[in-house]
Regions:
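N-terminal small/polar loop signature for handling phosphorylated ligands or for N-terminal nucleophile
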Residues: 35, 43, 47-113
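Hydrophobic alpha-helical segments
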Residues: 26-28, 67, 94, 119-122
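Fold-independent oxyanion-binding glycine-rich loops
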Residues: 11, 52-53, 104-107, 116, ...
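Short, electropositive, low-hydrophobicity segments enriched in small/polar residues
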Residues: 16-19, 23, 55, 84, ...
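An N-terminal, well-structured beta->alpha segment
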Residues: 1-67, 71-72, 163-182
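Gly/Ser/Thr-enriched, mixed-charge loops and adjacent short helices
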Residues: 114-182
Length: 182
C-alpha cells in the first residue's frame, strides 16, 4: 500500500521509503508514466530511459518501475546507476530512440527518502518537459483504479541485457565537447 497523496506533487513523487514510497508505488508510477508518454507522443511503444541513484532503496524501486513501464508495452531502457543530468542528456540526445526518461532519486533529501522524477522530449522544440504527477499522472492512475486495472501489480518481463552504458556515453560526449571548446 502507498500514500495516494504523493501523486499530487507537481515535480516528482517523493517520500520516506518504505512507508510512503515503495515498490508498489514505483510499479504504478512506471505504468502511468509509460501510458502518459505513449499518449503524448502518439507512440504505442515509447522508449524510456530509466536511471537510479546510489540510495539503498533505489535498486528495488528501479526494478519495480521498469516492470511497470514494461507492463504497458513500452520499452524501458535501463541504465543503472546514473545522475539526473545523465538521464536528461540521454533523452535530449534520443539515445537508442528514447523520448522520455525517469530517474529514481530524492536529490538532496536525507537517505531515508527516495523519489521518482521524469521528463518527456518535446518533439516541436527538442526541449525536455517535466512530467508532473499532479498534472499528468494522477488522472491516469485514478482511471486505472476505477476500472480495476490498478489492482495488484504483476511482474512484466523486461530486457536484462546490456544497459545503455549511459555513464560512458555521457563522459565521452562531455570530453568531446571540452576538446572542441579548447
Amino acid at each position: 500500500m502507498f500514500d495516494r497523496s504523493l501523486m499530487q506533487r507537481k515535480a516528482d513523487v517523493r517520500g520516506v521509503y518504505p512507508n510512503q514510497i515503495n515498490e508498489e508505488l514505483a510499479w504504478f508510477v512506471g505504468q502511468c508514466i509509460a501510458l502518459y508518454v505513449a499518449k503524448a507522443a502518439q507512440n504505442s511503444q515509447p522508449r524510456i530511459i530509466v536511471g537510479r541513484d546510489g540510495r539503498t532503496s533505489s535498486p528495488a524501486l528501479y526494478s519495480a518501475l521498469v516492470q511497470g513501464i514494461a507492463s504497458t508495452g513500452a520499452v524501458a531502457l535501463p541504465c543503472g546507476l546514473a545522475t539526473t543530468d545523465m538521464v536528461q542528456w540521454g533523452v535530449g540526445e534520443q539515445l537508442d530512440g528514447a523520448i522520455a526518461g525517469v530517474m529514481i532519486t530524492a536529490s538532496h533529501n536525507p537517505p531515508e527518502y527516495n523519489g521518482i522524477k521524469s521528463v518527456l522530449r518535446n518533439t516541436a522544440t527538442g526541449s525536455l518537459d517535466m512530467i508532473s504527477p499532479a498534472a499528468h499522472l494522477a488522472s491516469i492512475f485514478d482511471a486505472g483504479a476505477a476500472s480495476g486495472a490498478a489492482a495488484a501489480p504483476a511482474c512484466a518481463p523486461f530486457a536484462s541485457g546490456p544497459n545503455l552504458k549511459l555513464q560512458e556515453r555521457f563522459t565521452e560526449a562531455a570530453c568531446d565537447r571540452s576538446v572542441s571548446l579548447a
